[in-house]
Amino acid sequence: MHRTTRIKITELNPHLMCVLCGGYFIDATTIIECLHSFCKTCIVRYLETSKYCPICDVQVHKTRPLLNIRSDKTLQDIVYKLVPGLFKNEMKRRRDFYAAHPSADAANGSNEDRGEVADEEKRIITDDEIISLSIEFFDQSRLDRKVNKEKPKEEVNDKRYLRCPAAMTVMHLRKFLRSKMDIPNTFQIDVMYEEEPLKDYYTLMDIAYIYTWRRNGPLPLKYRVRPTCKRMKMSHQRDGLTNAGELESDSGSDKANSPAGGVPSTSSCLPSPSTPVQSPHPQFPHISSTMNGTSNSPSANHQSSFASRPRKSSLNGSSATSSG
């Protein structure tokens, strides 16, 4: 399966940094003529003495260059989300500035201009932040009842709550569930958001950004347990071998009944179809005992064992029947 390429923040720096001050964008502002971006204070100060873009020398405006620059909120949000701690440090600098200069006119500015916006309001998540999440079993039957608007049955609340670092990956969460619930390696655990399985390399911060978590409650996650693909392939091979064994035993009995078949047929060493098949997952009540459309319970027609069936053999050309 193709894995998404993850790159370092230093590889994106040319797209996130202002060429005038050498730092990350603060109040990113873009020239509409050439779409080059700078910090607001940097480009305003530069255009006081020049009417051309500092990067490509395109004329911004003949007389009033400030008319052709626009605030770029989308770019600024990207910078805040990609650079750890930048938003928090900038808000602190603004609060400190207005505390040291109470006469500065900040009444006309927004809360963000005054540094009075918290990370939660801006939906900025840092790697070291602790995220509250809920995890519960993904019940397909419950989902079907909800879709069909059936009356829900009395259900046990199996939802659990965790507090984890934002940098924790889905793979770590799967390992935690396997260890906590003693799930054997023959079963696969999928962590899901609503009905969509999540990739192992997703962090909780990635999930919060991708699915626009609003912090109005714990991050809702689900999990399901299912047999691994390898186990399912082995079951298919076992079924094929059993069918081949039945064909072989039938052909052997035909040879015993024929006049030319002087050698008694030998019983197959493959397991008998009448042998009861144990449920592969008795410890997981959530998992159905039916796999690939076939039930694991033995058929009623195969209750009698091969040992109790009469055996036919040929002795001196005469057919004899002996019971086991």
From Swiss-Prot:
A zinc finger (RING-type) spans 18-57. Residues 277-307 have a biased composition (Polar residues). Coiled coil: none annotated. The keyword Repressor applies. Gene3D superfamilies: Phosphatidylinositol 3-kinase Catalytic Subunit, Chain A, domain 1 (3.10.20.90), Zinc/RING finger domain, C3HC4 (zinc finger) (3.30.40.10). Residues 160-180 are annotated as: Interaction with PHC2. One of its GO terms (cellular component) is ubiquitin ligase complex. GO terms for molecular function: chromatin binding; promoter-specific chromatin binding; RING-like zinc finger domain binding; ubiquitin-protein transferase activator activity; zinc ion binding. Component of a PRC1-like complex. Identified in a PRC1-like HPRC-H complex with CBX2, CBX4, CBX8, PHC1, PHC2, PHC3, RING1 and RNF2. Interacts with RNF2/RING2. Interacts with RING1. Part of a complex that contains RNF2, UB2D3 and BMI1, where RNF2 and BMI1 form a tight heterodimer, and UB2D3 interacts only with RNF2. The complex composed of RNF2, UB2D3 and BMI1 binds nucleosomes, and has activity only with nucleosomal histone H2A. Interacts with CBX7 and CBX8. Interacts with SPOP. Part of a complex consisting of BMI1, CUL3 and SPOP. Interacts with E4F1. Interacts with PHC2. This is Polycomb complex protein BMI-1. It comes from Mus musculus (Mouse).
